[in-house]
Amino acid sequence: MGIDKGVRVLSELNIRIAGIFLVFMIILGPTLYIFDGFVQNTGYYLQNVIRLGFWTENYQQTDWQNNWTVFYWAWWISWSPFVGMFIARISRGRKVREFILGVLIIPSLLTFLWLSAFGGSGLYIELQGVAEIGGAVQENVATALFVLLEQFPWSFVSSSVGVILVIFFFVTSSDSGSLVVDSITSGGKLDAPVGQRIFWANAEGAVAAVLLLGGGLSALQTAAITTGLPFAFVLIIMCYSLYRGLNEEYDRELTLVQERDKKSYESTIRRIIQRQKKQEEEVNN
């Protein structure tokens, strides 16, 4: 259905439900504890993001770097081709500062708040001895969310909303990826044939299903991050291209401004000269 009729409607509905879910957790959970954690977590991230980015565990082998930093870097690098193209497509016509605000800053802050709300609530319940959230996470990460929601009122409703959100997040990501692959295979056309789009969506789902059935979630994750390393070199080239593109755009805008200022200056000089000539003619007459 495309961006306007399909992805946009589904994404907006997804965001609304996620927002309601977040507010639900903040209000019914330990509100003050969540906001304190949000401030502290954000500050801790800003203080340590560079340090941990260069941390190689040379003196203490805990596998934390491999299981978190390296894994998620490779994970997001493998997602970057279609995510970047999709964001670029929906951001067409936006200013650079609007793009940075809407794609980097606001989503990052919302992510901090989301993790502080749900993670903070889980930690609070664990520390108060109400329930063993940590044990539930170690036993089965996929069901730990529902163990957390059971500690709050309307657990059946909130658990149902959680399942719906998981489905919507997956469908939104899959739909966006299929849309980008469809655009690439059609030579960059914005409106490719619907049948081709359906084919790529089904193919994407079939590949994911085969990997899940054949090797479980780990096989699917391995297949996703395998493309991370080779595409990292492509990203370096893309970063350089972006740098050159921004410089060329700046030079072009600077040239246009200089030409406009020059024309304005010349026009002002002509008006002054014409005014002086007119005054001289009046004096002579």
Identify the meaning behind each predicted range.
Residues M1-R94, L101, I106-S159, I167:
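Membrane-embedded translocation segments of transport machinery
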Residues A18-G29, L110-G120, V161-L179, W200-E204, ...:
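Hydrophobic alpha-helical segments of multi-pass membrane transport proteins
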Residues M25-I34, S116, A206-G215, I269-Q276:
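Hydrophobic alpha-helical transmembrane segments in multi-pass integral membrane proteins
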Residues Y124-Q128, L246-Q258:
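Short, Lys/Arg-enriched, Gly/Pro-containing loop segments at transmembrane-helix junctions
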Residues L211-T226:
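Extracellular/periplasmic helix-loop-helix junctions in multi-pass membrane proteins
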